[in-house]
Amino acid sequence: MTDIRIEGAKIIIVGGNSGMGLALARRLLGEGAAVTIAGRSEDKLAAARRDLGDHPGLATIAVDISREEEVATLFRNSGPLDHIVSTAADIEGAYQLLPTIELMAAQRVVESKLYGPLLLAKYGAAHLPPSGSITYTSGVAAYRPAARGSVVAAVNAALEGLVRALAVELAPIRINAVSPGWVDTPIWSFVAGDAKQATLDSMAQRLPAGRVGRPEDIADAIRFLIGNEFTTGTILHVEGGHRLV
């Protein structure tokens, strides 16, 4: 495998202020990359800076990737980049049975996990070199859907279709996605509420891997996709064997 150099690379991580994105930012900064974390919440961006120790290679910027002009401005001001990553997902209120789901909650999932990634490619690709990459996160719900998860399952599947199409259209820039399984991140507070830990523990007992994922597991997978110059149009499953049970 030829591993693309990360030291000195300029990388934008959308959604890097918590969970998987924050773990990735920590890893890339440790390898000498210049990392910009983009997110909607100034408070969460400030918390990420504190968590990462105000690293000299770190910058943060407030942006809503569902708003086209904000995405255009992000890249207008970014200059040349090497890689773009998005772990952003707004699923608050989306895990509901059909009789109770609100369309606005479904719309937020579409905006954060489909429209947003589309806009990142539309405006970001021109700033990437031929060796550059864009990496998204989809999710196991596209393969193992469950009650209350219809919206997330559908949007994850749509994002994976977008990945394959963009890999052809934007070649030789590489476009990939990591499909995580159940990962212990703050997003579970929206999904399970007070039952978060019990829910994750129950899934850990089912999985062949014997545990749920950690943010670092997904960061490792994204790092692989960034670095492997012969991988494109690929969905990398990192889910502890969830699709098997």
Language model features with spans:
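Conserved glycine-rich Rossmann-like NAD(P)H-binding loop of the short-chain dehydrogenase/reductase
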Residues: E31-A47
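Conserved NAD(P)H cofactor-binding loop of Rossmann-fold oxidoreductase domains
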Residues: V85-Y95, G240-G241
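C-terminal substrate-recognition "lid" of short-chain dehydrogenase/reductases
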Residues: R211-V238, R243
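Catalytic loop of short-chain dehydrogenase/reductase
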Residues: D90, L97-V110, L114-L120, S131-A171, ...
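Rossmann-fold cofactor-recognition segment
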Residues: L52-E69
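Conserved Rossmann-fold SDR core element
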Residues: E160, E169-T185, T231-V238
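Catalytic Tyr-x(3-8)-Lys segment
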Residues: K196-D217
